[in-house]
Each structure stands twice: as structure tokens, then as C-alpha cells.
């Protein structure tokens, strides 16, 4: 890897104007493209403190061998140039929100003499118009079946079309009036194309106009006493209305908007977008990709979300307009809506809004919904994004091949003697030194073993509003492994005693008590009978050193210890000055992150429970024989603990279930407080 100092531009040579920059590797390939309001400020951030950069950004900077830039006059020009370069060079370190091929769309082959309607998955093609994407293929087929009654366009493949053209008979759809049968000349190419164009207009959102036109023709046919045509048109109107009912009305009529939401963790981001046209959700799509680029170095919270918004909108709408330019009869205004609803406005959103307006050809409004139906829909999209990220992580975690690869990668990266089939992880949780607790979670074969989870209330390393995270890690480690050390010592003494007495050697299965960690009554292993292959602490070098020191004191040498720092996802090993950096997309890092996050979740849950109990505790809790029901009855009867404290024994005994002895004990506890 290259040293960034070898290609860092000389001081004062980087301009302060807005522009776009490119990092190239030693082969001259562009590996990253970014834009900046101030090129000097942005590029200097890559070289000032390389160690503090996000791991993926750090990898990019150390992979690069040179950097170059282009100055532009406005930030809008920078947006456009950045998009063009990303599209041209396809840099490996830029996030690409490529269309998810798993989402089906309805394709219309307008580039053919007789356009065809069909369900499609795959890359976009020139001359084909697409509607969707939809969540399920059956939803497209169901809607298409309804609309073919009104718009009897061709749906067959090229081979089927040619065969029926040769035999001179239409297919079944032609006989039931769900195809205009252009294969046998029932309609001309121009008439068939007109049917397809009406179909496209309907799906594009011009629904009310189409329904009104059919109703007008229906009434005209009835007035002319052409009841057969009127009945057919009536059925067509009903079919259109049924198709419309399948698209939920979520916003006001005439509303065209895209609603976008994100869900993130330290490594990945899930994006969901709902396409609303004429107040109805016409399509939905989503992606889960690795975090990359400027967004990961923007901090957390609103700054990160704003950077993700800018990154996504620039690439997504740029590509959608490019697709529209390749498709006849589709204008940029159909893919860039009048309104884009996002969770957070990025810095300099006015320039982004101007760029989107240029793409559309008319004004585009970029805003964060605050209330009403738009806010509710934005929350729905956000829930979808969170669910997509959770499902993505669950799918990876549940895959046996991925788990096996993760364990093998961890073994190789940390130079372990064997794969860490049992991993234990510790996390500390507190609020300003109060209610300090720890959690210990267990993963076996890459899956959580929740029956072995443990909580710890920190005793020695916390108290009086202080908390020592390093000391807390040491305390938990000592409490966890002290029993293991004790059982091993007892087993060694028993073995020595047996050998000294000349006891015969017997099989382990016959004498379960001779083995450490075995319950003498059941012969089964205790839950913590075996040490972990890998012991993970949440933190960096100090926490790892504390845990390793405790294990050395206890004489436990067969447990590997590492630390996983939260933000940078660095793996710290005892005695090593530099962390181990696992590839960001590796199964090993994903598993370690999941173990750490589970320990964090479990610790927070216990911390909140302990804090809640403390905040609701009272002197009544210390009264022997006074349960929760009678404590509640006392407080309810007197209205508060203060009034109960002022009551007499006789007044307290008026409460059902409270005797004289209990009443005296209550008053004694309250006055002692």
C-alpha cells in the first residue's frame, strides 16, 4: 500500500474553489471520485490524520497513488461533473446504487413494430419502457390481466407471435378479447401501437382522463342504442377501477413525489424509495450497500444522513434520466417528480435542488415532511428500510456457508490455532457512571446461544457516580473466568489424588465427576463448562490489555482476546501497537460486528431495567413480608409515601391486608429513611 504522504499535493497548490477530484491507483485507474465546496479543505482532510479515517476511506487513500482535480464555477456544475465521472470510470470505492435485479418491472418494447407487454427482471435496455418496480411479480400479472381487457396489447414472445402468424390463427387471448391479435392482422401496426400508448398513459398516471373518456364513449353508445358496445365499455371502466383500487391512495390527488428513507449501521446502508404518482404508490425499490465515500466521514446523525441523501439523489436521478433519454416517449419529467421527500436536507441542498430541476426541466422541491400524510408515508418508508437492513443481516447470519467462512476468516486473520466455534463478548453500559452493568453474550458456530447470556452488576469498578470502563472489563473478565480456573484446579487435584492412591484409570463416561465443568448429578456439561475460543471486549487497546492481564493472572492461556472498536471497526490484539483491519465486506467483520452489537443491545436492556427499578424504588421495598400488591394498596390509599409516613398505626391498619406488626414495620422503615 502507498504512503499518502508520497503523493500529497504541495501546500498551497490546492485551490479553494468548488470542484471535483479523482484518486488514481498505481495503474492509473480511477478508484474514487468526489466533489467539494472547497477542494483545499476537502482534500487536506484525507491527508491530515490518516489513522482517524473510516477504514474504507483509509483503504482508499492508501491504495491511491495520485490525486487530481478539476475546478468548476458552481456547486451545481460540481454535482453534474461528479455524476458524469462516476458513470464513466465506475470507481471501486464509490457506492453504486444499482437497480436491484430482484425487483420485477412491467416492460413495454416500444422499439418493436408490434410492442409487447411482459414482466421483466434485469438490466435496462434501450427502446424499452419500464413501469415499476413492484414488490411481487404476481402483482404485475394480476394488474396486467385486468388491463388487457381494456388495452388488448400483445404479450406473447417473438416465437409465439411468428408461429401464429404462420398458421393464421390467434392464440387463446385473441379469442377471449384480451389481445387484439396483430399476429393475424386484426389490427394494423399503427392501431396496435395506439393501444399500447394508451396503456402506457394509464400506467404513467393519466388514469382519470382515461376513465372519463371511456365513460363518455359509454354514454354516447347508450344514447345511440348501441347497448352491446355500451356494456363492453362499462366492463372496461369497471376493470380500470379495479386496477386502480390495487394502488393505495396515500397522498392528495395530483401529488407526484418520491419518498426516500435510509437505515444504517457502521458498515452498510439500506435505501428504500416509494414512487408516488397522482397520489398513488406506483412503485417501490430498495438497495443494501456498503457505506463509502464522503458520507462515512461526515460523522453521525444528521450530517451522515444528509451526505447519504446527496450521494443517493445524485446517482439515482442521474441514471434514471439517462434511461429516459434512451426510451422513446419518456421524458425526464416522468422520472424526476415535482417533489422529493427525504429524511434530512444535505448541506447546500439548494444546489442539489437546482440540479434536479435542470434534470426535470421544471422546478423540483426537496423537503423534509413535518406532518400529515406525507410524514406518515415517510415513516412507513423508513420502517421498510429498517426491515430491509434487518432481513439482509439476518440472511447473511443464517447462511451456513457464510458463517463457516466467517469463522475461518477470523482464524486466519488472528492466527488462531482453530476456528473460534465459541465466541463470548463483553459490553459495559452506564449513564454518567450510574447503574453500571455489563453483558456477556455467547455465539456458538456463528449463532447466538441465548441460554448462556449473562448480566453483571459492576461492583468494584463503579460507584458514587464514577465508572471505569477498563476496570469494569477487568472485573467482568475475572468473575467470568475465576470459576473456570477453580474447576480446573479442582480437577487437577482430583487427578493427582487419584494417581497417588493408585486408583485405576477409568473411562470419562463412567465417572462424570472426574471431568471439570460436568454436573455430578446429571453428567451433563454446565452452561459455562467450556472456555470460549475467542473472548471479545467492546473497546480498543486499553480494554483488551485489561482483559488479557486478568487471564494471565488466572493462568488461562487457551483463550484468545481481541477488542472491537465501535466506529472504526478496528480489531485490537493484546501487545500489538496497531490494530488488525478486516476487509469491510468480509464475513469475518460482519460476524464480529453482530456479536458486539448483540452484547451492546443486551447490556442496554439490562441497564434500562436496573435504572427503572432504582428510580421507582422506595423505603417500602425493604419491609419484610410487604409485597408489591400491598405496597401499591398503601400508596393508593394515602396518595403518596409522604402522607403514609405521617399516618398512625391505626390508620395504616385500615388498609385491607395490613396488620399491626406490618404497619409498625412500615412506619419504622419510613422514619429510618
Swiss-Prot record:
Q: List the GO biological process terms.
A: nucleotide-excision repair; SOS response
What's the chief localization of this chain?
A: cytoplasm
> Please, which domain of life does this record's source organism belong to?
Bacteria
Q: Which Pfam families match?
A: GIY-YIG, HHH_5, UVR, UvrC_RNaseH, UvrC_RNaseH_dom
**UniProt keyword terms in alphabetical order:** Cytoplasm, DNA damage, DNA excision, DNA repair, Excision nuclease, SOS response
Q: Read off the SUPFAM superfamilies from this record.
A: C-terminal UvrC-binding domain of UvrB, GIY-YIG endonuclease, RuvA domain 2-like
Domain GIY-YIG, by residue range, is: 16-95
Q: List the disulfide bonds.
A: none
Leader peptide range in chain numbering: none
Any one GO cellular component localisation term in the record: cytoplasm
User: Positions of the region Disordered?
Assistant: 488-526
**Per its UniProt record, what InterPro entries does this chain match?**
GIY-YIG_endonuc, GIY-YIG_endonuc_sf, GIY-YIG_UvrC_Cho, Hlx-hairpin-Hlx_DNA-bd_motif, RuvA_2-like, UVR_dom, UVR_dom_sf, UvrABC_protein_C
Q: Which GO terms describe its molecular function?
A: DNA binding; excinuclease ABC activity
PROSITE patterns given for it? GIY_YIG, UVR, UVRC
Where in or outside the cell is it found? Cytoplasm
Domain UVR: from-to ranges: 208-243
Q: Quaternary state and partners of this protein?
A: Interacts with UvrB in an incision complex.
Q: Which family does it belong to?
A: Belongs to the UvrC family.
Return the HAMAP family for the record: UvrC
Summarize the protein's role.
The UvrABC repair system catalyzes the recognition and processing of DNA lesions. UvrC both incises the 5' and 3' sides of the lesion. The N-terminal half is responsible for the 3' incision and the C-terminal half is responsible for the 5' incision.
PANTHER family, A to Z: UVRABC SYSTEM PROTEIN C (PTHR30562:SF1), UVRC/OXIDOREDUCTASE (PTHR30562)
Q: Identify this protein by name.
A: UvrABC system protein C
